[in-house]
Amino acid sequence: MYAIALIRYRRPLEEVLTVSDAHRAYLLGLKERGLLLASGPLNPRNGGALLLRVPEEGAQETLDRIRDEDPYTKTGMAQYELLPWVPNLGAELPQTRVARLPSLRPAVSYASCC
């Protein structure tokens, strides 16, 4: 299952940057585990986005854990919006089209901190 995570900064960029090395290290760990397909900052620099692929079984729990364990979330620097996504067309997609949306909680899943 695919998901897009929109990350919105809750603090000034100067403060967010103090945690960015830990955030990047965390993302590299997600990439090594095969969960993170792409990541990058938004323009203007008020947040970022992640393209995630998680197993269908336990998808919501995995997405919640990804959000909750991010140093940005743990320090209150940012909040996540998790959006389940069903890609239909693209260079790296399997030939079969996904016919149904997975049954997850509502699309918005914010950190409960701060």
Q: Residue ranges of each PLM-predicted region?
A:
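Conserved, structured core segments of small domains
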Residues: M1-C114
